[in-house]
């Protein structure tokens, strides 16, 4: 007989610095509301993201009826990767009139490769167009 499936009671989506999850907000209150062991999650998340320090890594936490949980790591947000590639702190407040930085098409393709599994694109060219659109909306010029 197949094992019974656990009943899902919640899905939590968070964006946390890699290797730096702690019980303080926003992690603690979000998990505490679902009755999840916060320290257990923090230790597991920090261990899983240790090699990605310096990036914000989104995570999807599935909470089950017995208060156990699974989590799935996503790729860092395209905006954060673009800012890192352009060497900027933040995007433009008025992106269509004031450009704040430049990235090459090669950098855009590299970011698209990184994000490919999370993007809704069939091939790398379509993924690169999505990333280039994000860059334009941040006031970053794509060259090439």
Swiss-Prot record:
Matches recorded under InterPro entries: Ribosomal_uL11, Ribosomal_uL11_bac-typ, Ribosomal_uL11_C, Ribosomal_uL11_C_sf, Ribosomal_uL11_CS, Ribosomal_uL11_N, Ribosomal_uL11_N_sf
GO cellular component: cytosolic large ribosomal subunit
The keyword Ribonucleoprotein is annotated on this UniProt entry: yes
Keywords: Methylation, Ribonucleoprotein, Ribosomal protein, RNA-binding, rRNA-binding
Tree of life domain: Bacteria
Cystines in this chain: none
Molecular function via GO: large ribosomal subunit rRNA binding; structural constituent of ribosome
Gene Ontology BP annotations: translation
Pfam families assigned: Ribosomal_L11, Ribosomal_L11_N
PTM description: One or more lysine residues are methylated.
UniProt keyword Ribonucleoprotein, yes or no: yes
Oligomer and partners: Part of the ribosomal stalk of the 50S ribosomal subunit. Interacts with L10 and the large rRNA to form the base of the stalk. L10 forms an elongated spine to which L12 dimers bind in a sequential fashion forming a multimeric L10(L12)X complex.
Family, per entry: Belongs to the universal ribosomal protein uL11 family.
Function description: Forms part of the ribosomal stalk which helps the ribosome interact with GTP-bound translation factors.
Name used for this protein in its record: Large ribosomal subunit protein uL11
Species this protein is from: Corynebacterium glutamicum (strain R)
């Amino acid at each position: 007989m197949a094992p019974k499936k656990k009943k899902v009671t919640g899905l939590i989506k968070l964006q946390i610095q890699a290797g730096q999850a702690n019980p303080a907000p926003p992690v603690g209150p979000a998990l505490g509301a679902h009755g999840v062991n916060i320290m257990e999650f923090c230790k597991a998340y920090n261990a899983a993201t240790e090699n990605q320090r310096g990036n914000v890594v989104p995570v999807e936490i599935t909470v089950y009826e017995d208060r156990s949980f699974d989590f799935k790591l996503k790729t860092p947000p395209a905006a954060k990767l673009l800012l890192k590639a352009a060497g900027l702190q933040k995007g433009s407040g008025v992106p269509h009139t004031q450009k704040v930085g430049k990235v090459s098409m090669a950098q855009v393709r590299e970011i698209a490769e990184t994000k490919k599994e999370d993007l809704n694109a069939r091939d790398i060219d379509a993924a690169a167009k999505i990333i280039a659109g994000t860059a334009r909306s941040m006031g970053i010029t794509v060259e090439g």
